[in-house]
UniProtKB/Swiss-Prot annotation:
GO function terms (MF aspect): structural constituent of ribosome
InterPro entries from the UniProt entry: Ribosomal_uS2, Ribosomal_uS2_bac/mit/plastid, Ribosomal_uS2_CS, Ribosomal_uS2_flav_dom_sf
Keyword Ribosomal protein carried by entry: yes
Pfam families hit by this protein: Ribosomal_S2 (PF00318)
Phylogenetic classification of the source organism: Bacteria, Pseudomonadati, Pseudomonadota, Betaproteobacteria, Burkholderiales
Keyword annotations: Ribonucleoprotein, Ribosomal protein
One GO BP: translation
Protein name: Small ribosomal subunit protein uS2
One Gene Ontology cellular component annotation held by this UniProt entry: cytosolic small ribosomal subunit
Highest rank taxon of the organism: Bacteria
HAMAP family cross-referenced by the UniProt entry: Ribosomal_uS2_B (MF_00291_B)
Amino acid sequence: MSTSMREMLEAGVHFGHQTRFWNPKMAPYIFGHRNRIHIINLEKSLPMFQDAMKFAKQLSANRGTILMVGTKRQAREIVATEAKRAGVPYVDQRWLGGMLTNFKTVKTSIKRLKEMKAQQEAGLDSISKKEQLTFKREIEKLEKDIGGIQDMNALPDAIFVIDVGFHKIAILEAKKLGIPLIGVVDSNHSPIGIDYVIPGNDDSSKAVALYARGIADAILEGRANAVNDVVKAVSAESSDEFVEVENAAN
């Protein structure tokens, strides 16, 4: 789950946006500028990223769910891959308004998608070619819109967002519902309202991969720790029972 300063440098995490686009609220996290490009202070970014991973690990250990969000072109495949590896829901295409605040309606769409997939597996020979085409188009649209959250039965316990400026609606919905936010914030956006800020480049695919991999690793590690704790607890109970029986025999 560890990430080094060198890895951040190699991924280009320190490269911000052009100075003319900067958000003054990011001033505490900016080291300086070079060739009119802001340089993000990795001495700030690294410990803040570690804090975010620690939170993700603890939440996962407590059986919490983290929704991973990254719909920018350079983030889509990375987010989907890492979320699948970690076994958590994700949004990689577009954020549907009300995905959180109107989750009841979204659950209806999820139910529809699952029913259609079951119908597809059973075979579509009973309907006409035209109906099959309409069916195919609908299921493709549902897969694109909500495929990544089809196993999310309730609201997430936290959200990880790459590029807070690009996902303003998702952030507003999370804040409205009091859902904690982990967010990658570049030099041109505001960190205000983000619970776990990761100051860094949100455009480089290498940087995006570093963030997503780190959060996914933290989730997996937290889950593994939880399983180990359960195994230890069960083993301890078994040992206690054995001792009691032995004492009774004496």
